[in-house]
Amino acid sequence: LDNLDDLPRRCRRCVFWELDPVSRDRAAEAGDPALEKEAWISSTLLEWGSCGKIVYVDGAPAGYALFAPPLYVPRSVAFPTSPVSADAVLLMTAHVLPEFAGGGLGRMLVQGVAKDLTRRGVKAMEAFGDLKGETGSCMVPADYLLSVGFKTVRPHHRFPRLRLELKSVLSWREDVEVALERLLGSMTPEGALRPV
């Protein structure tokens, strides 16, 4: 929530995913969709936890991703390839600013989201891809999703649903680290380790 102002203006004011179409139109008429976005993020943070990532290059925001369980995303039921699978979290949007494109930041964003979700016990991430990939859209281009490891699970001529099994994103090293954490954690007396 502290970094919300670092989102590009178009995303900061966009509530395409966060509100149903009627509520979205009302927010636009009231003139403050950014306030609705902030309320949605705050509510999701309190109830579910972190729902976004921003990547910075030399202190400047270079890209972002927003994600949440489909239950928190009213628009997720409006697609011809709905619903999102019960064991998955929805990658709502992801974008790398043009001046930072081509440097692997998109892959890094998806890997960061995947690592976060894996720690929470989530099995997969799904997204509705946009085969037209229109500039300025809050939809994720399908070719981007495919390039970072997603597979099509429900084809469609415009909005296929794609899925990334989270185990496939973790490297061998990360698997070993997780196994060691589990092993050492299980041998630690309860109460010896406390959150800071």
Where is each model-derived feature located?
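Conserved acetyl-CoA-binding loop-helix of GNAT-fold acetyltransferases
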Residues: 93-96, 102-118
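Glycine-rich phosphate-binding loop
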Residues: 104, 140-141
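Conserved catalytic-core motifs of GNAT/GCN5-like acyltransferases
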Residues: 128, 142-163
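C-terminal "cap" of GNAT-fold acetyltransferases
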Residues: 138, 154-194
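Active-site rim helix/loop that mediates acceptor-substrate recognition in acyltransferases
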Residues: 11-52, 56-57
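Conserved acyl-donor/pantetheine-binding loop and adjacent beta-alpha core of acyl/acetyltransferases
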Residues: 31, 43-50, 56-93, 139
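Conserved GNAT acetyl-CoA-binding A-motif
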Residues: 110, 117-136
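Conserved beta-strand edge residues that scaffold enzyme active sites
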Residues: 59, 131-132, 159
